[in-house]
Amino acid sequence: QALVATISAFILKGVIPAEPAVAAKSGGRSLKEIVRQPGFLKTVFSGAVAYMVMNFLMTAAPLSMHMHGISQQASNLGIQWHVIAMYGPGFFTGRLINRFGALRISATGLLITAGSVLAGLCGTDIFHYWLSLILLGVGWNFGFTGASAKIIDYHRPEEKTQVQSLNDFVVFGVMIVGSFSSGALLNLYGWNAVLWGSLIPVGIAFLCILKRSHKTVVVKHE
């Protein structure tokens, strides 16, 4: 914990938050019109899935480790590496998005998340949990950041507030559902059921991205 705190303090040293820009209060399309754009809902859905599955598995993993006789210390360390994996790639995720595109990075994140599930299905040793959690963190970073970056293509500056508010509402609403349901599913059916259950939304979200990968929707910022 001390090492993580020290690294965080070093990174944030001297960082001064910029003054928030004042969004335009006039003009812009209705939220209904924005939502009806081809691909918008699929983009929101893929971002919500990336966040929900991350929280779903992260919540259940420590409980499952305890159920399989793994120490609390090992469980805590696994979560710490998971958090590092979540935010560590943030130093270069933006560059990857600029180079390869938001959709590709989001799809890559979902594939890494699927890899996290497969790692968990391989066994219940410490290594399996840690590998699963680390992959889960990286998958979340790519999947959620890519989807969030793609959302920008669907709104103009004066529409930013309402679009981001809707996106956040959906993402965090779904995340809460996943967080509360993971413990119950783990208790009733076990760790493997939690893992298999995670693959379904990940697969659907990945297919949604594949269908959008050959189309580009760009809003002209007039």
Model-derived regions, located:
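C-terminal membrane-cytosol helix-exit motif in multi-pass small-molecule transporters
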Residues: 1-20, 208-213
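Juxtamembrane intracellular "pre-TM" segments in multi-pass secondary transporters
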Residues: 14-44
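Helix-to-loop junctions at the C-terminal end of transmembrane segments
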Residues: 89-102, 186
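A late C-terminal transmembrane helix in Major Facilitator Superfamily
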Residues: 159-188
